[in-house]
Amino acid sequence: PENGRIKIDVIIPAFRPGDKLEQLLKRLQKQTWRPNRIIIMNTERQYWNAERYEPLFEGSETELTLIHLAQEDFDHGGTRHRGILESDAEICICMTQDAIPHNRELVKNLVSALMAGEDIAASYARQLPAADCGVIERFTRDFNYPGISRVKGKEDLEILGIKTYFCSNVCAAYKRDIYLKLGGFTAKTVFNEDMIYAATAVKAGYKIAYAANAEAIQDRK
């Protein structure tokens, strides 16, 4: 690992990737804390453009691991889980292919929030609205991803209720040892595998950190 730092892998499920994935891969390699490996779980080999993405890793300190899946084998929880099992890093960051780091500090700030306490199992980034998103989407992002960081645990259930378990599959970091101990993401989940895992972690006495200074832009267009 760089400078004796903790080893970090980034796991990205990809389906018919395009410009966003290229932008994401370029920005990940410019992070102040560079990932050791980027593991791409790609659905259907024919949609992967090797000439476009693989040269981005030539001469890079970050390695590419590419795993092709059949479409029927893809599901949100199970595919990410396979990626985490493929990793040997202490920390795994799961990102969607349309999540773009807002600046060069995303990985550093996300990992710092995760490492701030031994009992923190996961940390998730702040989602910034894309410049051209609508008013309702902007409001929802601001509501779910406020400007102040916080750590959530069992003691917050009375006040926050189900929001205690809020996490994000757009950009979140996990301590791999705790993840494996708790059994990881539920396979065959269509969505919310991150919140199901967060609920399991909180009930087991762990905490979830929201890192407001780790910023990603999700642009679905």
Regions found by a protein language model. Give the residues of each.
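Short, well-formed alpha-helical segments that are part of the catalytic scaffolds
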Residues: 17-30
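Short beta-strand/loop segment that forms part of the nucleotide-sugar
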Residues: 36-45, 67-69
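Conserved donor NDP-sugar-binding/catalytic core segment of glycosyltransferases
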Residues: 104-138
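A recurrent flexible, glycine/aromatic-enriched loop bordering the glycosyltransferase active site
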Residues: 155-174, 190, 196
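Donor nucleotide-sugar recognition loop
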Residues: 168-169, 180-199, 207-210, 214-217
